[in-house]
Amino acid sequence: MKFNKMVSSDRGKNRKRHFNAPSHMRRKIMSSPMSKELRQKYNCRSMPIRKDDEVQVVRGHFKGQQVGKVVQVYRKKFVVHIERIQREKANGATVYVGIHPSKVLIVKLKMDKDRKRILDNKAKSRAKALAEKGKYTEETMETS
């Protein structure tokens, strides 16, 4: 069921908005889940990925245990390039293989003051949501 009349549920329109999204929106779209340890530490599930984060590929051909550093976040193509994930072209040159951010797990964050502030805000709002969760009891339901 649709709750907001102003938001379209048309598949074609949503795809158009996704693939024609400006760079500042692509940053948000290109978020990656965080490892269990980071989730516990920061009380936050996912973060927009950035250069110098350490990630682990969890899906696809390159999945495995080795951890690599993000070399480039290629917003135009919705992919990230990771340190040791390369392939050889026909002419012998090596190129990075693009991997979608949803298929990697952030293992270590590159921290700065802005990112710290974002994590604090996310943790605060999550704590507030947990505090409000289940606040309706039988008495409050009967009175309304």
From Swiss-Prot:
**What is one process in the GO biological process aspect for this record?**
translation
- In which domain of life is the source organism classified? Eukaryota
- What family does the database annotate? Belongs to the universal ribosomal protein uL24 family.
Recorded GO MF terms: RNA binding; structural constituent of ribosome
Q: Which GO terms describe its cellular component?
A: large ribosomal subunit
Record PANTHER family: 60S RIBOSOMAL PROTEIN L26 FAMILY MEMBER
PROSITE patterns noted in UniProt: RIBOSOMAL_L24
Ranges for the region named Disordered are 1-22
- Coiled-coil portions: none
Keywords carried by this UniProt record: Ribonucleoprotein, Ribosomal protein
Q: Report biased composition (Basic residues) as residue ranges.
A: 13-22
For this protein, the record's InterPro entries field holds: KOW, Rib_uL2_dom2, Ribosomal_uL24_CS, Ribosomal_uL24_euk/arc, Ribosomal_uL24_KOW, Translation_prot_SH3-like_sf
Q: Which SMART domains match?
A: KOW
What Pfam families does the record point to? KOW, Ribosomal_L26
Q: What is this protein called?
A: Large ribosomal subunit protein uL24
